[in-house]
Design a protein with these regions (language model features):
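A beta-strand edge to alpha-helix "cap/lid" segment located at domain peripheries
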Residues: 51-131
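Short acidic-aromatic low-complexity motifs
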Residues: 2-27, 131
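Alpha-helix N-cap/loop-to-helix boundary motif
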Residues: 1, 13, 38-42
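Short, flexible active-site loop motifs that bind/organize anionic cofactors or intermediates
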Residues: 11, 36, 104
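A solvent-exposed, acidic/Ser-Thr-rich amphipathic alpha-helical stretch
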Residues: 18-71
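Exposed alpha-helical structural elements
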Residues: 4, 8, 20, 45, ...
Length: 131
């Protein structure tokens, strides 16, 4: 199951679409952000965060550098550069027996990257509300 989700996730990252993302998320998915204090619960809000992150990382040479999968979990380390700032992070993705994502946790370093992502994600989320 992990390999299927991993392949779907990579296909989504290569050609992001709301439809593809929606098909991977459990209705009660939880999104845990490095820049929001409380976990965000539910498919609509998780989609909003992940789609906004996709916009933030557009044209950043985002790439996964390491991937580990075991027992209903994918852990994928990533790197990117935004506005000349290096970003290193980890996506920790839990999934159920149907292959649907039940929790998506993002961890990011260094602190300058966290601060920049907080600003850029805020801008994207505001733009999404206005649209």
């Amino acid at each position: 199951m992990a390999h299927e989700l991993q392949a779907k996730w990579h296909a989504y990252m290569d050609a992001p679409s709301a439809e593809a993302l929606s098909g991977m998320l459990h209705e009660d998915v939880t999104f845990i952000s490095p820049v929001v204090f409380t976990p965000q619960r539910g498919k609509p809000v998780t989609m909003q965060y992940l789609l906004s992150a996709g916009h933030v990382f557009t044209d950043t040479q985002f790439r996964y550098t390491k991937e580990i999968e075991a027992d209903g979990r994918l852990v994928m380390e990533f790197e990117a550069e935004i506005d000349g700032k290096y970003i290193n992070g980890v996506d920790i993705i839990d999934f159920d027996e149907d292959g649907l994502i039940t929790q998506f946790k993002v961890m990011v370093r260094p602190l300058q990257a966290v601060n920049m992502l907080w600003q850029k994600m805020g801008e994207q989320l505001e733009a999404a509300k206005s649209a």
